[in-house]
């Protein structure tokens, strides 16, 4: 099985082409084996490239534990760079079908290489039934006791569920494990620990549902900026600093724009 390994701000993925649906139904098993950091290649998840009649291309995301993910911000940047530079879709504006619908992506090209990727991530959704969360009112600075800690949480759907915690002092990232599985969230939640530096800068650390601590999470960065803006903590153009680097998130009338890059690590053959 041919593959490429890529990363977006340290959030790493294995990209495989399945243009003839050869691996349909085997995605979870493939992801668990390939993503294992001792017995496999090692990654936070896999990105599967598939044809689609209604779009330029389709992206399927599987987490390292074999679970399906509707959307991944860092993953879609890697995916867009891959399909352009591998010659699968040679367009600087492309529509990618994801589990969260079609995402329009604008590529900045220099010497036939993708320099910057601008993704319209759509809008955040605070409706509890859509997150989903087992409550009637929006989760805005809700006080909860989870595990051994007390937190104020804000939750929304950004393609996948995200819970935001604004911290004055750093919580251990492992707190995310208990919050991910908190009874309020029947399907679990990603957890983002945020610190506002100024009105145009934030730091974000993410515990990713199904993957654990990660160096970056694109949907989490977008969700964090949306939550911070809703609470009046930041403006609409924000630089987000994560352990693996930084990117820009802009809140615009037609959706939230995530602007960053992605990198190839290696190509290879996996003996599946």
Swiss-Prot record:
Gene Ontology biological process terms from the UniProt entry: lysine biosynthetic process via diaminopimelate
Listed EC numbers: 5.1.1.7
Reactions catalysed according to its record: (2S,6S)-2,6-diaminopimelate = meso-2,6-diaminopimelate
Binding site for substrate: 11, 63, 73-74, 190, 208-209, 218-219
Tree of life domain: Bacteria
HAMAP family, per the entry: DAP_epimerase
Family according to the record: Belongs to the diaminopimelate epimerase family.
Protein name: Diaminopimelate epimerase
Organism (species): Clostridium perfringens (strain 13 / Type A)
């Amino acid at each position: 099985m041919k593959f490429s390994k890529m990363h977006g701000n340290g959030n790493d993925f294995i990209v495989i082409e399945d243009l003839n649906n050869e691996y349909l139904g085997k995605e979870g098993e493939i992801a668990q084996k390939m993503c294992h950091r001792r017995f496999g290649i090692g990654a936070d998840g896999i990105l599967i490239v598939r044809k689609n009649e209604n779009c330029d291309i389709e992206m399927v995301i599987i987490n390292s534990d074999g679970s399906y993910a509707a959307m991944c911000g860092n993953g879609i940047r890697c995916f867009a760079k891959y399909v352009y530079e591998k010659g699968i879709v040679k367009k600087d504006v492309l529509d990618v079908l994801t589990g969260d619908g079609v995402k329009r992506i604008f590529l900045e090209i220099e010497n036939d290489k993708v320099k910057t990727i601008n993704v319209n991530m759509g809008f955040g959704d605070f409706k509890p039934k859509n997150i989903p969360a087992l409550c009637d009112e929006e989760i805005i600075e809700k006080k909860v006791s989870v595990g051994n800690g007390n937190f104020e949480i804000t939750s929304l759907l950004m393609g996948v569920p995200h819970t935001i915690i604004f911290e004055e002092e750093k919580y251990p990232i492992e707190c995310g494990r208990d919050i991910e599985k908190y009874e309020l969230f029947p399907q679990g939640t990603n957890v983002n620990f945020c610190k506002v530096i100024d009105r145009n800068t934030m730091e974000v650390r993410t515990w990713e549902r199904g993957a654990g601590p990660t160096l970056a999470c694109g949907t989490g960065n977008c969700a964090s900026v949306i939550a911070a803006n809703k609470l009046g903590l930041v403006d609409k153009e924000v630089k987000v600093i994560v352990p693996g680097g930084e990117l820009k998130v802009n809140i615009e009338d037609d959706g939230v724009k995530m602007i960053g890059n992605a990198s190839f690590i290696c190509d290879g053959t996996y003996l599946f």
